[in-house]
Amino acid sequence: MEPGIPPMIDKAPAYSHVLIAGGIGGATADFLMHSLDTVKTRQQAALYTNKYNGMVKCYSTILCEEGVFHGLYSGVCPMLIGSLPATALFFSSYEYTKRHLMSNYNLPETLCFLLAGFVGDLFASVVYVPSEVLKTRLQLQGRYNNPHFQSNYNYPSFRGAVKQIAKQEGMKTFFYGYRATILRDIPFSGFQLLFYEKLRQVAQKECGQKDIGVFRELITGSLAGAGAGFLTTPLDVAKTRLQTMIRTTDKVSDDINSGRYFFAKDENSKSKSAASLVKPKIGIRHVLGGLYKSEGLLGLFRGFGPRIFWTSSQSSLMFVFYEGIIRLFNKNNVLERD
């Protein structure tokens, strides 16, 4: 070990391995958990219907009415296209920032983990936010010409959605809810990595070795995801509402124009969604305030059950795959020093 370099940094994997393991691990976990993410999105955005109350009820309703691919796995294409490069960029940025802070600055280890998580997600957000907009809208829509749920979106395909949004709403639409997304994901990632690193250290002390095994990795990853998910649920609800709104300058109701309400009912719809006429230039602060006024504290935690289940499960799977791929590199004797 070189003098002055913390043991954690000296034994760290190569950045190229972090890039590969992060991309594969993140995308695989996101794919496996996508159906639950669809359930969470429907619950958060379906304002004026009780159709999707309850995680199990919502899951079974979508499955029975719309099927797997066009229902529970709607929006999976933009998710994968965004997830692979985004998680690869996230893990590599996180590792670089963490090592740089720990090697060059006299900062507490806890703060290094937290700040590195913030930076990693900030870099990754440039890639995943546009895909998140597409994914969220397609999840809310479900199948094309969906007779079971009216979301005010009806894209024939993933490519059709890209073309229609770009033509009718402009390219800036792909970054709708960007501020809300990074305000949700930057703290989420920071807390997730902080919790994971600290819990992993506890597990390493308990078992007396660096490799804590798959079971402990599942537990530490799950707890890290659950804790971070709980703290950021209101921001996740606001992000979903912002990305599924249809912006318009048309006059709607006096309540909406006065800023008292931010979601309008479409009386012709059999079931209503958040994709309704709204006041232009609505921000995350306005959405959170409107949610609290109209739905109370429970409105801020709408979709809490599936979100916590998703963040804990996705986090555990992601870290298991990530650590497993890193171990494969080590076992194959290809670990290199940067």
UniProtKB/Swiss-Prot annotation:
Record flagged with keyword Chaperone: no
Keyword terms of this UniProt record: Membrane, Mitochondrion, Mitochondrion inner membrane, Repeat, Transmembrane, Transmembrane helix, Transport
Solcar-type repeats, residues: 13-100, 108-202, 216-328
Keyword hit for Endoplasmic reticulum: no
A cellular component term, taken from the record's GO annotations: mitochondrial inner membrane
Localization, UniProt: Mitochondrion inner membrane
Protein's name according to its UniProt entry: Uncharacterized mitochondrial carrier C1442.03
Main localization, broad class: mitochondrion
Classification via InterPro entries: Mitochondrial_sb/sol_carrier (IPR018108), Mt_carrier_dom_sf (IPR023395)
Swiss-Prot/TrEMBL GO biological process terms: magnesium ion export from mitochondrion
Membrane topology annotation: Multi-pass membrane protein
Transmembrane segment boundaries: 13-33, 71-91, 110-130, 176-196, 218-238, 301-321
Coiled-coil segments on the chain, per record: none
One example GO MF annotation: magnesium ion transmembrane transporter activity
Described purpose of this protein according to its UniProt entry: Mitochondrial solute carriers shuttle metabolites, nucleotides, and cofactors through the mitochondrial inner membrane.
Lineage: superkingdom: Eukaryota
SUPFAM superfamilies referenced in this protein's UniProt entry, alphabetically: Mitochondrial carrier
Species annotation: Schizosaccharomyces pombe (strain 972 / ATCC 24843)
Family: Belongs to the mitochondrial carrier (TC 2.A.29) family.
PROSITE patterns recorded: SOLCAR
